[in-house]
């Protein structure tokens, strides 16, 4: 063998033969080889370029929040093109830019005389280009189905903040006539489909319809029978998330006309309590839920929205909710053998009590406004009738009107502070002492759902009455400091912020206790604390007394959002 003889081993590659082969190649073959090499180089450079684009996506997402308008517009255009070419991460930018809908839409003139379009109008153009413009080669029905699917898919995995911004965007687009009527009808078909479609599709359809109804209340008002039959009927009873979004859609039936400052008139539509809608709403609240998944969040979400709908749409919501609380109280305290269900029913009752109390306070404010509106109308009529005989001076009329409004305001304030939670005939007063007792006895009532509901209701009760707030403020601060449940601590922080808005002096005296949440190990508690403190400080509701260092530490936090 060659290894034994010491002779060098011959290479398997014959270089001479290779050179001879290259020399023998024809001119056409040589050109083909060069073209293949150039093509390979082109693809390599293209891949490098794509990787560089993907690396720049996170930076461009941050530029969407830039104070430089030109940078924002260029970033939006990049994500529009990148999304069409399916660049990895482009969908993150398209999803992030939706919050720009809240930007003030003012055109900007550059130094060269060119004019930059407003950010909000440009955002509408980008979304129309990506999800609404017709694709070439599609029929009319295929285009409508594609637009419908694109709109529904925008709700998949969306956060609450994203859904809020999406609602503002789609409502503006609908107000401008960019959403075709055929698309709306297709969304209703998906929502009411008798076929076993996915839950996400049906939920997405009613979410989009609810968003569009913000600009056109008739869109859901005309289909109320469908809402009651599907979302509050047999389908919604098995899918409480669908029922929740159906209740949100019902809220738009009343109309979204905002009250103009200085006026008394309101534009909400209300229905008699005999309307079948209220029977369905009460039924969805009272229906017992023993499913483990429903216990975590779904039932509480649908109950909250159902109560909101009752108070917004009903002519006498307090009477209906009184009967609702009586039925739930009897069910919670009825003797059964299933101890677990008893505790969960108690948690449901406590939650409903708290939210009814809060909505009743808002209802009293509406009643006060209605009293003032009717009195203003009577005064106008009386002034017109007596104007010819003995006209009164403007100052005299203003004094009388102001005195009457003060009397009405004082009466309502007394009812709110003394009657709702302390009145001898008040149903809510029965739970005024029960809720703090549950919160302060975690060993006796260890159920996590009951504790969360009780803490939330305690916060709502404290926003109603100054006397109740002062009596239980120490307990709420104690929960914020010692509770082992991060959800209870997070809700306690938000509750303290709400209490500070209602009764600022009480919280300002204990503001240093609020800063403790900035050092909480749970990210949700920390974010809620920072959000509440930012709101209270910027609006002058609490004073900073040497705690700036605690806020400055947040700049070094590992979490970028903090």
PLM feature spans:
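Extended alpha-solenoid helical-repeat scaffolds
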Residues: 1-562
């Amino acid at each position: 063998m060659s290894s034994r003889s010491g002779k060098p081993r011959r290479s398997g590659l014959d270089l001479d033969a290779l050179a001879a082969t290259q020399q023998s190649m024809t001119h056409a073959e040589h050109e083909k080889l060069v073209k293949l090499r150039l093509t390979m180089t082109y693809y390599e450079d293209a891949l490098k370029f794509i990787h560089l684009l993907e690396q720049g996506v996170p930076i461009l997402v941050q530029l969407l929040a830039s104070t430089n308008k030109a940078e924002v517009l260029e970033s939006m255009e990049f994500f529009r093109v990148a999304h069409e070419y399916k660049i990895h991460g482009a969908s993150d930018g398209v999803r992030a830019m939706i919050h720009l809908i809240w930007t003030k839409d003012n055109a900007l003139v550059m130094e060269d005389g060119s004019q930059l379009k407003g950010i909000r109008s440009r955002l509408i153009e980008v979304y129309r280009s990506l999800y609404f413009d017709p694709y070439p080669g599609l029929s009319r029905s295929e285009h409508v189905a594609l637009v419908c699917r694109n709109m529904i898919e925008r709700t998949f995995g969306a956060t609450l903040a994203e859904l809020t911004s999406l609602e503002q965007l789609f409502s503006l687009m609908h107000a401008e006539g960019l959403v075709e009527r055929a698309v709306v009808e297709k969304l209703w078909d998906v929502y009411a489909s008798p076929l076993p479609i996915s839950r996400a599709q049906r939920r997405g359809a009613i979410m989009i319809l609810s968003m569009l109804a913000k600009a056109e209340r008739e869109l859901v008002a005309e289909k109320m029978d469908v809402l009651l039959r599907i979302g509050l009927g047999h389908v919604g009873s098995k899918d409480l998330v669908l029922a929740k979004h159906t209740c949100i859609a019902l809220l738009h039936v009343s109309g979204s006309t905002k009250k103009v400052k200085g006026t008394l008139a309101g534009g909400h539509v209300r229905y008699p309590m005999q309307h079948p809608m209220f029977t369905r709403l009460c039924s969805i609240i009272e229906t017992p839920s023993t499913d483990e998944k429903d216990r975590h969040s779904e039932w509480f979400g649908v109950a909250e929205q159902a109560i909101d709908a009752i108070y917004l749409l009903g002519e006498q919501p307090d009477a209906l909710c009184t009967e609702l609380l009586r039925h739930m109280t009897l069910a919670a305290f009825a003797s059964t053998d299933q101890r677990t269900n008893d505790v969960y029913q108690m948690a449901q009752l406590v939650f409903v009590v708290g939210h009814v109390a809060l909505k009743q306070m808002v209802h009293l404010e509406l009643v006060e406004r209605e009293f003032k509106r009717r009195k203003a109308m009577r005064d106008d009529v009386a002034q017109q009738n007596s104007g010819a005989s003995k006209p009164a001076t403007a100052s005299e009329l203003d004094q009388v009107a102001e005195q009457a409004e003060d009397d009405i305001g004082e009466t309502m304030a007394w009812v709110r502070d003394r009657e709702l939670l302390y009145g001898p005939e008040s149903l809510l007063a029965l739970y005024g002492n029960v809720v703090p007792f549950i919160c302060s006895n975690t060993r006796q009532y260890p159920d996590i759902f009951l504790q969360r509901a009780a803490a939330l209701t305690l916060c709502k009760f404290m926003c109603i009455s100054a006397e109740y707030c002062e009596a239980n403020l120490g307990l709420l601060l104690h929960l914020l400091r010692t509770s082992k449940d991060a959800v209870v601590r997070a809700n306690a922080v938000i509750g303290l912020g709400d209490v500070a808005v209602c009764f600022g002096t009480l919280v300002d005296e204990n503001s240093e206790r609020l800063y403790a949440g900035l050092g909480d190990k749970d990210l949700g508690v920390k974010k809620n604390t920072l959000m509440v403190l930012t709101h209270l400080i910027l609006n002058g509701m609490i004073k900073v007394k040497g705690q700036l260092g605690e806020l400055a530490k947040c700049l070094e936090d590992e979490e970028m959002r903090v």
